[in-house]
Amino acid sequence: MKTRGLVFVVAFLTASVVLATPSVENVTLSQDAESGEVTIGYELAGAPAIVTVDIQTNGVSIGGKYLKRMSGDFSKLVTVDGHHEIVWLPDLPWADAADTAAFNLRAEVLAAAADDLPDILVADLRFKNEVSYYANVESLPGGLWENPEYRTTKLVMKRVRAKNVTWTRGSSQEPGAVGLSNFRCEEAHEVTLDKDYYLGLFEFTQAQLQTLGLTTAHAFPGAMRPCDKIAYTFLRGSDAKYYWPADPDPNSILGKLRAQTGLKFDMPSESQWEFAARGGVGENHGDGYWGDGTPITSTGTCPNLTAQARCKANAYVTNEDGSETALGTAVVGSYPPNSLGFYDMAGNVRERCLDFWQGANDYSGAITPSNGKNVTALAGAVNVYQGELVGDNRGKYIHEVCNKEGYPNGADSGTYYHVGDLFPGGDRVWRGGCWDDNASNCRPRVRNGWSAGGITTGSNLNGDIGFRVALTIE
């Protein structure tokens, strides 16, 4: 074998066979002596299947960084049984490559059922319906950090395995919650999501928006900085006929994104967003902790937050004359990820969610695990009101149940359900805090709202409202 500057010994080539349902058999490798091009052949049975490939030397993956120049029937849904090929031109040296005496190259080809989607989905926004799948972030061709496309022209989504996981959403006990004027809106209650979903690894960037053919003014311009000053109406459309669960306006951000990818992207629901922001469930992922499992130690400047997020404590520089200059947002991915692998869930920009915002007392009905109020939240569903009717036709509190027309009255006496569009045009929820927020407003459990359309008044002049997208796995 040979690549640029390297000579490999063909006799050391081997191939592994990984059986699954569907199955892959007869994996072969060969290399063209002149071009150095490697051809990986395999036989697929039980199509359709999502096929992924990994290249290993000495039993260790070389990583996606070295697989940028790879093409063929992999990382996508393969619909036909039989022989398939993958072509790879290895043009970068890796750690083991120069040691020809010990060198041993292996291709591991995996096939998964079409309904068992891999953890990483990548949509190439430059082309129609160009969607790829990978086993993990480390498998991304060219490398997540080495290849700027993943934050400019491609959209990287990570699967959140939350189906049937019961967890406690909200908090009234952690630092930054107790004593806030709106702390009751964080009142703890149990939630169970009924579907897994993909969520953007990063906040949606300005370059990604431009790739969709859309432009808007940003407070802090930069290709890999997050979109800011983003109105809910720009995301979905301003007419009530475009409110969830209807399809968005074709000319909106989500309308353009759906048309380009063929996938039903949307904003995350609050429950989807918070589950991911908490870093999952379990020890160190509940009250009083950031999404990376470190404790919240302050409502103002928390060192555990400044280590993982662009926030007020690190978003300003002091000039020689004593004045301050705002650095604003950071390039997405500038700080470490949380425990589920997501970046900038705290700080940078506040992130829009689908849900309606009804003020500081949304949870005044004391929804707590102790009173048996367990909620099944359909992934992607938002604000169904469950409770006793009051004068303004609003329930006393919200459960994330199922926002669909004609949702029936509850079996319990005095219980009422209605969809979120009781309040068309109302404020929508934001989550996560921004570059200009203290620790109390960056907590995974903090909730607040902002006008669906207004982006040019008040704090929005500072460029604090952005978004990331979600995709429910049906």
Predicted regions located by residue number:
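Functional-site microenvironments in short loops/helix caps that host divalent-cation chemistry
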Residues: 221, 229-444
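Structural beta-strand segments of beta-rich domains
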Residues: 36-40
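Solvent-exposed serine/threonine-rich low-complexity stretches and specific carbohydrate-binding patches
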Residues: 63-78
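Short, compositionally biased P/S/T/A/G/V-rich stretches that sit at domain boundaries
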Residues: 20-33
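Short solvent-exposed strand-capping/beta-turn motif centered on an Asx-Ser/Thr pair
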Residues: 45-47
